[in-house]
């Protein structure tokens, strides 16, 4: 009996050790992805304080946080290659009246931008939108074979925003498709056609919370961090995990220094919780991929510094490569 009791702890220790080995092996076998960043377009001369209240311009100030009146904001798209899987996170936009009314420049079609990286738009297998606003979900139809991943909460928010009776609150769509600055602004007619075009064609997965869409590639909900159905995308890479945040973290400076950004529809507490989630997943802030950071494609945003100028003055960056993946930088 005593001998059996002595053997049992040894067996338990052996089983635990084997479990650790199997876990480490599984992690080692997890696909490592390559990732790039594409600038869909650029909002020009945006008052810095309207994007980040903590960076509001103060005339005559010598403080670096308050002496910049305007900034140019990129609209960033993530391109992720995991083995044979090609995933796009956010799509930017193509609706020319929307680009014109927002003073945007440096736009180029997403299929042409993908060609610069050596990809075909028809080969994109999955597209995840951080949320369904006009500058993030406007080119879904240009990825004909991609399955859309969108949160159910986001679709519910679209319906609510378009139908709410009080015009100061609902998403007001004015001729020729403009958007008055309401709390629900951003769900534009031509953009909603893009989103529901995928849904109606049976090319959409409606997500409820968290979901793994490919080995190691995980959607995380960030509800109300920008919109009701905001979502993040975790991606395993050779430099650690990346988290693409769309407007849940619009700004690298914001997530680094804990400042809210792009707060038009944002619950600031939920935005900070999205920041925290990226810290927990990646171990810090350097691998958090922001949607509109003015410092994108420069050394001041280190993840994006391996960059170049591409179509129509728009920029691209090679974030990280999987083992054996050749650089696509010209």
Describe these PLM feature segments:
Residues 104-150:
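Active-site metal-binding motif and surrounding structural segment of the metallo-beta-lactamase
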Residues 11-21:
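Bacterial N-terminal signal peptides
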Residues 42-44, 93-96, 132-135, 155-157, ...:
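Solvent-exposed loop/turn segments at secondary-structure junctions
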Residues 26-119, 123-126, 153-221, 239-247, 266-285, ...:
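Metallo-beta-lactamase
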Residues 1-7:
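N-terminal secretory signal peptides that target proteins for export/translocation
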């Amino acid at each position: 009996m005593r001998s059996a009791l002595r053997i049992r702890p040894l067996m338990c220790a052996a089983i635990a050790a084997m479990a650790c080995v199997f876990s480490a092996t599984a992690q080692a076998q997890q696909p490592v992805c390559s990732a790039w960043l594409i600038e869909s377009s650029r909002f020009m001369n945006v008052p810095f304080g309207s994007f980040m209240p903590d960076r509001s311009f103060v005339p005559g100030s010598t403080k670096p946080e308050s002496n910049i009146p305007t900034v140019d904001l990129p609209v960033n798209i993530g391109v992720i290659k995991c083995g044979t899987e090609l995933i796009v996170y956010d799509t930017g936009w193509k609706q020319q009246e929307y680009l014109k009314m927002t003073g945007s420049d440096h736009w180029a079609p997403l299929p042409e931008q993908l060609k610069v990286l050596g990809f075909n738009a028809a080969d994109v297998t999955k597209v995840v939108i951080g949320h369904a606003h006009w500058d993030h979900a406007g080119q879904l139809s240009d990825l004909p074979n991609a399955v859309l991943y969108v949160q159910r909460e986001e679709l519910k928010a679209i319906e609510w925003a378009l139908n709410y009776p009080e015009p100061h609150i609902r998403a007001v769509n004015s001729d020729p498709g403009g958007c008055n600055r309401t709390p629900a602004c951003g769900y534009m007619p031509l953009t909603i056609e893009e989103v529901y075009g995928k849904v109606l064609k049976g090319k959409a997965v409606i997500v409820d919370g968290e979901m793994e869409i490919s080995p190691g590639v995980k959607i995380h909900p960030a509800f109300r961090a920008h919109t009701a159905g905001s979502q993040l995308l975790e991606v395993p890479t050779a430099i650690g995990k990346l988290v693409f945040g769309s407007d849940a973290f619009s700004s690298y400076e914001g997530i680094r220094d804990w400042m809210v950004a792009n707060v038009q529809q944002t619950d600031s507490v939920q935005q900070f919780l999205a920041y925290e989630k990226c810290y927990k997943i990646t171990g810090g802030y350097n691998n958090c991929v922001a949607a509109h950071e003015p410092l994108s494609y420069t050394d001041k945003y280190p993840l994006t510094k391996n960059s170049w100028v591409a179509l129509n003055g728009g920029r691209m960056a090679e974030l990280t490569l999987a083992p054996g993946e050749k650089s696509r930088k010209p």
